[in-house]
Amino acid sequence: MGQRQAKQHMQAGVKLYHQRHYAQAINKWRQSLNRLNNAEDRFITLGYLAQALCDQGEYEGMLSYALSQMQLATDQNDSAMKCEAFLNLAKAYERLADFTKALQYGKASLEHPSMDPRTPGYAHLTIALAHLGMSQFQQCLESFESAMNVANETSDRLLELQICVGLGSLFTLLRDITKALIFLRNALAIVQSVTVDDVHAKYRCLILYHLSVALRMKGSLVDAKEACDEASQLAVEMGNRAIHARCMCSLADIYRELGESEAKETITKSWARYEDAYRVMRGANDKMGEVLVLSSMAKSASESRSHYTGQCECQAIQLNKKCIEIANQIGCKHVVLKCHLRLAELYSQLNDDDSEETARRAASRLTQEMQLFCNFCGQRYGLKDESLQALRCSHIFHEKCLHTYLLQRTDQTCPKCRCRAVLSDNISIRSSIASTIDVQSPSTSFAPPGGVATPLVSAAAELGDITPQATLTRRSQQDKILRGAEKDIDRVDRSLARLKSQQSAAANACSAVAVPSPEVPSTTASCASEPILTASTTSQSHTHSNANHKPPPPPRKPCCSQAALPPSSIVALPPAMPLAEDGPLVITHTPTVTDV
C-alpha cells in the first residue's frame, strides 16, 4: 500500500466516523497507521484513534494511543506535538480517574507552545475536571474560569458548551440545583447550533445525562426519567459505554425514589439496574463510574433496607465501606464524605456509639478539607438545595449571606482570602445577557496553517467533497434536531419555573422572620428575603427590570470583549432560533481531537 493510498484510508476513516460507522472508521485508521511513514500523518491518525476510543468509553485504549503520540512527539522533538500529546494523556488519565497524573499532564500541556490557540482552553478544562473529581472545588472553579477565558478569546462554542456541562455538574454536587439547571440549559442552547449529526448527538447525550441527575435531585422525577431515557438511547446509538452505564445508574436512582411512593417492584428494578451498570463500569475500568454506582447502591441500601429480602444494616455498611475504599483510591473526597454521613446514621441505629463518633469525625474533617461551609452563617452547604455565589477568587458562599455582608461593608473583600470581592463573570448568574446571535453563531476559529494540534480541522479542509446526504444533517433531520433541543430547553424551563415558585412560597412563609448571623448583624425580613436571581429572572430580566429593585451587586473586574458584550455568554438564555433555510448545514468549527 502506497503512502497516497494510506492517506486516503485515513481520510476515509473520517468520513465513516461522521457517518457513525465507528468500527469501520477505527479499522481504516489502524490500517493506515501501519503503512504511513510521515510523522505528522501518523500523529494525526493516532489522534483520531485516541478520540474515537474516548468517545466509545474505551479509556485504556485511548491511553495507549496517547502514549504512542507522546513517543512520536519526543522522537520528533516537536513542541506542538508534545502539547497535544500531553493533553490527550491528561484526558485519558482523567477518564481513568487517575486525577493526579491528569493534573500533571494537563499542566505539562500548558507549558508547551501550541499551534492552535484553543488547545490551552481544553487543557484548563481537563485540569478543572480532574480537580472536580478530587473534590477540590476552589481549584476547579479557577480552571473553569481560565478555560472560559480561552473560549471567549477564540469564540470556541464547543469548549464553552463543555464548560457549561462541567459547571452544571459542579453545582449539582454542591446542591445549587438552580444554577446547575441554568448552565445545562445554556449548554442545550449552544448545542442547537451544532448541526453535524454525530457531534450534536454526542453532546446532547452528555447534557441530557447531567440534566437527568439535576432534575432528579430537584424532585422532577418524570422529567428526569424522560431525559435519562433519551440520553440512554443516544448513548447506545453512539456506542458510548461510559455514558450508557451512567444513564443506567441515573435511571436506577430515579426508580429508587419513585419506589418510595409507588411499589416494591420499582425498587427491585432499581437494584438490578445498579448491578448492570456496575458490571459495565468494572469491564471498562471506569473507577469514577464504579464509585458513582456504589455510592448510589449504598444510599439505596441505607434508606430502603426493608424492600430487600434478607438485607440489614450490615449489608448497607459493607456497601458504604466498599465505596469509601475505591473513592479513597482515586481521591474523591465528596463521595467519601457522603458515605461517612450514611455510616454515622447506620451506626446510630445499631447503637454503636464509638463507630458513629468515628464516622462523624471523619465527615467533619472532610467538610473542613473541602471547605463546604459558609463563613458568614457557619453552616454547611451541599446538603440541601441552596443558592450559592462564587467570587473571582473562587471562594463560595451562600448567596444571601454574601449579599447581606457586602451591603453592610464599605471595603468589599472576600472574608476568606481578603481579596477584592468581585463576582466571577463566568460562573455568576448576575452577569448581563449577551445577544442571542453571539450565543448561537458558530465558531469561526481555525487552526493556523500547518497546525497538527487539532488534526480534524485540517482533515475537514481536505475532505470538502463530503456529500451532505452521507455525513451532514439533512433539512428534515436538522428540523428534528432543533425540535428536540427546543423540547429539552422547555423541559428545563418548566423545572426552573416550578423551582422559582417553590422558592417564592418559602420566602413568603418566612417573610416575618429575621435571619441571624454569627458574624453579621441580624437583618430584617425585607433584607433577608431579598429576591434571588433564578433562571427565569435571568432570561426575562429585560421585562422585569422595573419590577425588582435589588441592591447593586459587588463590582466586576473590567474586561474586554467583542462588540462590547460581556466576557462570557454562558449566562445568556436565548430563545430557540431556527437556522436560515439558505444557511450552512454544518458549523464552521469542525470537531477536533480536543473535542472529547
Curated annotation (Swiss-Prot):
One of its GO terms (biological process) is positive regulation of neuromuscular synaptic transmission. Keywords: Metal-binding, Repeat, TPR repeat, Ubl conjugation, Zinc, Zinc-finger. One of its GO terms (molecular function) is zinc ion binding. CDD domains: RING-H2_Rapsyn. TPR repeats lie at residues 6-39, 43-76, 83-116, 121-154, 161-194. Disruption phenotype: Mutants are resistant to levamisole, an agonist of nAChRs. Ubiquitinated by the BCR(kel-8) complex in the absence of unc-29, leading to its degradation. It comes from the Eukaryota. InterPro entries: Postsynaptic (IPR001237), RAPsyn (IPR052480), Rapsyn_myristoylation/link_N (IPR019568), TPR-like_helical_dom_sf (IPR011990), TPR_rpt (IPR019734), Znf_PHD (IPR001965), Znf_RING (IPR001841), Znf_RING/FYVE/PHD (IPR013083). Residues 535-563 are annotated as: Disordered. A zinc finger (RING-type) spans 374-418. Coiled coil: none annotated. Expressed in muscles and neurons. Postsynaptic protein required for clustering of nicotinic acetylcholine receptors (nAChRs) at the neuromuscular junction. Belongs to the RAPsyn family. This is 43 kDa receptor-associated protein of the synapse homolog. It comes from Caenorhabditis elegans. The lineage of its organism: Eukaryota, Metazoa, Ecdysozoa, Nematoda, Chromadorea.
